[in-house]
A protein has these predicted regions:
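Catalytic His-Asp segment of secreted/periplasmic serine-dependent ester chemistry enzymes
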Residues: 270-276, 319, 440-512
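C-terminal catalytic histidine-bearing segment of alpha/beta-hydrolase fold enzymes
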Residues: 248-300, 496
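Conserved alpha/beta-hydrolase "acid-adjacent" motif
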Residues: 239-246
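Active-site segments of SGNH/GDSL-like serine hydrolases
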Residues: 379-383, 406-456
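Conserved SGNH/GDSL esterase-like catalytic core that processes O-acyl groups on lipids
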Residues: 196, 302-307, 313-401, 453
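Catalytic nucleophile-loop/oxyanion-hole region of alpha/beta-hydrolase
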Residues: 93-95, 100, 115-149, 276-284
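Short beta-strand/loop motif that positions the catalytic acidic residue
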Residues: 232-234
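Primarily recognizes the serine-hydrolase "nucleophile elbow" in alpha/beta-hydrolase
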Residues: 133-196, 213
Length: 512
């Protein structure tokens, strides 16, 4: 029997003892790391193969306690992965769950960066900040290292899988991964259904707070359009980190949100195999993972960035797999690869800052700003027509203007918008170009949505504000008026055909 496999099984058996002493856990993991290191000469040394052009180490902290080992491929594809080793937040298993992946990834043209993060010892911000710093360095150095800064993923193993999922669900746009790979991940922070030491080491005293436990059980933090696509790799016989209450819950949350997610669940393998060749399904796993990575197409770096801001109609409420089938996704297909269209819609949101769910309080709003769009399509107002929200109608204009001038500060003084053109030249357009969409008709008064308020209150204000700032108006209320047959039963939300119709209308305007 392979010594690595045997060692892994011994560790798993020891760790199943509920009242084991922490020293036993640390000792077995340390012994495993020694065995892994002893086996390493059988593999090509990363950094000394034809696939790796450069191997070097960078400090992530001033004291050098956190470092990042960098592997740059000979033939870069533009894709990069930040690797997060496991080890129960007690040690770092950074060979089979770290550097061992370098040669395979570099062969595919993928730059690879292993973060040897500091252990939390109850302070979760310590490892989180180390990984964030790694992402900043990779994206800041993208041009020099041959990387597309919007094609940087994360790959974590076990407790490192938990940390990778935290980074994927709890990060601001600039340090959020573009895709996620989770090997047998710890997801739950409830030690009754998860790995006890990972929970205790990551949360410390906060493990006593049910709200914190829920927040960092990352299946609860998945958000539509925001949480990046994921691939989850597990074995059904994993007795250390139960798949049903960990990795499978993350997959379920992703699927319920409509986000892209692939689940690879093998019948055997236990826990802790990583990129080790002793895993019985090693070759099949790499082949499938490779295909998944190949189909993740990043936007062109010079693509025209289009931000679709809106409520549930933009979000894709009621449309299965809305990130693929909602109007922004269909708009992307219509506009083609020269554009990068992002969905920043959030259901139930209002333009009004005193509404029941103000859009400008949302993560999606911060993301839209960080996206630095060239074009913004704003489609808000439907929920503002509810009586409980429209009672603040006197503030609708100022809130709309606040959104516009935050997106484009140069419009804060309307008389100065745009640059003066030289004689014989057209004026350079203000960036981003902002399109105000009137709400589509409310074919029914579901949820107190009032089409009369939309027509007589909201749309006139939108048109006046557009005229003041020199913005274009897309009159969806008029252009969609004959498409009542493309609605869900509630009469408020378009179905997938209605989303396509909306995309067609908007695409025609953007192409003018």
């Amino acid at each position: 029997m392979n010594i690595l496999y045997l060692c892994t099984q011994i560790i798993n058996s020891l760790l199943k003892i509920a009242n084991m002493k922490r020293i036993l856990f640390l000792t077995t993991l340390f012994c495993a790391a020694l065995v892994m290191q002893a086996q390493m000469p059988r593999m090509a040394e990363p950094g000394k193969t034809d696939q790796t052009a450069r191997k070097f180490t960078l400090d992530l902290t001033e004291d050098g306690k956190a470092q990042m080992v960098c592997f740059l491929p000979t033939k870069p594809s533009g894709k990069a992965i930040v690797g997060i080793p496991g080890g129960g937040y007690s040690v770092l298993s950074n060979t089979h769950e770290g550097t061992m992946a370098a040669d395979w990834l570099n062969q595919k043209g993928i730059a690879y960066f292993v973060v040897n993060y500091r252990l939390p010892e109850g302070n979760r911000m310590i490892p989180m900040s180390d990984v964030w710093q790694g992402f900043r360095i990779v994206r800041d150095s993208a041009a020099v290292w041959g990387i597309n800064p919007r094609d940087v993923g994360i790959m974590g193993f076990s407790a490192g899988g938990h940390l990778a999922s935290v980074i994927s669900t709890h990060s601001e746009y600039d340090v959020r991964p573009d895709f996620t790979i989770l090997f047998y991940p710890v997801i739950s922070m409830d030690e009754k259904v998860s790995h006890m030491w990972s929970c205790r080491n990551f949360l410390g005293e906060d493990q006593k707070d049910p709200k914190i436990v829920r927040e960092f059980s990352t299946n609860n933090a998945v958000q539509r359009h925001i949480t990046p696509p994921a691939c989850i790799i597990m074995s059904g016989d994993d007795n250390l980190v139960p798949p049903l209450t960990n990795g499978l819950t993350y997959y379920t949350a992703m699927r319920n949100a409509g986000n892209d997610c692939m689940l690879l669940l093998y019948p055997t393998g236990g826990h802790g195999y990583g990129f080790g060749q002793w895993f019985a399904y090693h070759n099949e796993m790499l082949a499938t993972l490779g295909k998944w990575l190949d189909q993740l197409k990043a936007p062109k770096q010079d693509a025209i960035r289009v931000a679709c801001i809106g409520n549930s109609i933009t979000d894709g409420h009621g449309i299965d797999l809305a990130p693929r089938n909602g109007y922004p996704a269909q708009l992307q297909r219509m506009l083609g690869n020269d554009y990068c269209v992002k969905n920043f819609g959030v259901s139930a949101r209002t333009m009004l800052n005193k509404g029941d769910y103000p859009y400008m309080n949302e993560q999606a709003w911060r993301d839209a700003l960080a996206f630095k769009p060239d074009i913004v399509v704003i489609k808000l107002g439907t929920n503002d027509s509810k009586p409980e929200n429209w009672k603040y109608n006197a503030e609708f204009r100022q809130d709309l203007e606040q959104m516009i001038t935050t997106l484009c500060p140069s419009l804060a003084q309307p008389a100065k918008k745009g640059k003066k053109a030289k004689k014989g030249q057209a004026a350079e357009p203000v960036k981003p170009q902002i399109y105000l969409c009137t709400p589509i008709p409310a074919f029914k008064s579901t949820w107190n949505i009032n089409d009369s308020v939309i027509v007589n209150g909201i749309i006139p204000i939108q048109k006046e504000v557009a005229a003041k700032y020199g913005l274009k108006v897309i009159d969806l209320h008029t252009l969609y008026a004959n498409d009542g047959d493309k609605m869900l039963a509630d009469g408020i939300h378009p179905d997938d055909k209605g989303a396509r119709r909306m995309a067609q209308i908007i695409a025609e305007e953007l192409k003018k």
